[in-house]
């Protein structure tokens, strides 16, 4: 995390990752995406996602959701987000949409502290993402976003880890399950 925040060219890398995400989304068929509110120097996907919403073809409604962590179940729920919507802090002091509709996104964009071969993701260790994914039917398509320096060649999944379907960095698509 400290290495990510200390990158001298972090802003330039973020711009490149915004571009990679925007281009990658062009060919996707999903109409709803669950993302995250960036904390601790994480890449901010929301500008690219909002442009994705604005670029929807006529007659197609696209939605973005942000997670709400449920302490009791250890799962995530998603609430509709749009620029300017009223926000409040969740149980972990992370902003979440206040009083907007809850829905289950068709795709999840998730931050990665690090990533390994085969779609292995290193997160903060809370398990919210993995518990949520293992319980959802149908399972949303999952794409991780990270900076290239986060590649950990020896990272292996544990029994509980849910692999990503794709992983994007500022250098492009690093992994996509076929």
Located regions from the model:
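N-terminal active-site beta-alpha-beta segment that forms phosphate/nucleotide-binding
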Residues: 1-104
